[in-house]
Amino acid sequence: MYKDLTGKTAIVTGSSKGIGKAIAERFGKEKMNVVVNYHSDPSGADETLEIIKQNGGKAVSVEADVSKEEGIQALLDTALEHFGTLDVMVNNSGFNGVEAMPHEMSLEDWQRVIDVNVTGTFLGAKAALNHMMKNNIKGNVLNISSVHQQIPRPVNVQYSTSKGGIKMMTETLALNYADKGIRVNAIAPGTIATESNVDTKKEESRQKQLKKIPMKAFGKPEEVAAAAAWLVSEEASYVTGATLFVDGGMTLYPSQLE
């Protein structure tokens, strides 16, 4: 637990399930105020709210499309209305998109992933930074990227491109705001055993995926959440512009061991 996080206010986008849910729940354990965001899963958001409150935090949920400015504004307005400020912005919402060879991909399929993953992250960061700058808040922006900011993902060019974009966005924002006391970092998860990750469900795909991971195990959402709590705490006060890989060594090119 990080005592400096007690009473701080965070927005966590896409927090009705998976990694976002785990981060929001961990923030509850840190006794933080959390704005839970969902787009199409109100029951999941309700569950997240309940767990945050059980953990000792305070929470409210908002339905919003993070790829739209009005969606991000609704999140910020809710944070200010209920908790009076914003200290931490976690841009977690992400969309894998369809798998297709690039020459066969529609512009619509490309654009949807870019809109959510890149534009949504930018809009979330922009709103948070604007609030922090106006109010002299030495806050944190945390972007959830992926190992695919470094490892190309076959037949999913839009996803790899979006995560590579998040990497450079994180570093550029960190450079721009470091002297203002605002830290901007990213987490790049590997294969995490969430309810929607099919690679961790079926035995054939499980074994295929495990061969890519030196630790021979899938990550847990709670392990990503632990990294998130550390990065936005004062324990990481000298860390900015960094991507923390939570991947069991997946980016270490395990094929070199063969």
From Swiss-Prot:
Reaction(s) this enzyme catalyzes, per UniProt: D-glucose + NAD(+) = D-glucono-1,5-lactone + NADH + H(+); D-glucose + NADP(+) = D-glucono-1,5-lactone + NADPH + H(+)
Isomerase as UniProt keyword: no
Factors inducing expression: By heat shock, salt stress, oxidative stress, glucose limitation and oxygen limitation.
Family in the record: Belongs to the short-chain dehydrogenases/reductases (SDR) family.
Protein name (Swiss-Prot/TrEMBL): Glucose 1-dehydrogenase 2
One GO biological process term: monocarboxylic acid metabolic process
Assembly mode: Homotetramer.
Organism in which the protein naturally occurs: Bacillus subtilis (strain 168)
Molecular function as annotated in GO: glucose 1-dehydrogenase (NAD+) activity; glucose 1-dehydrogenase (NADP+) activity; oxidoreductase activity, acting on the CH-OH group of donors, NAD or NADP as acceptor
Annotated catalytic residues: 159
Keywords, comma-separated and alphabetical: NADP, Oxidoreductase, Stress response
Binding site for substrate: 146
E.C. numbers: 1.1.1.47
Lineage, opening ranks: Bacteria, Bacillati, Bacillota, Bacilli, Bacillales
Pfam families membership: adh_short_C2 (PF13561)
Binding site for NADP(+): 11-35
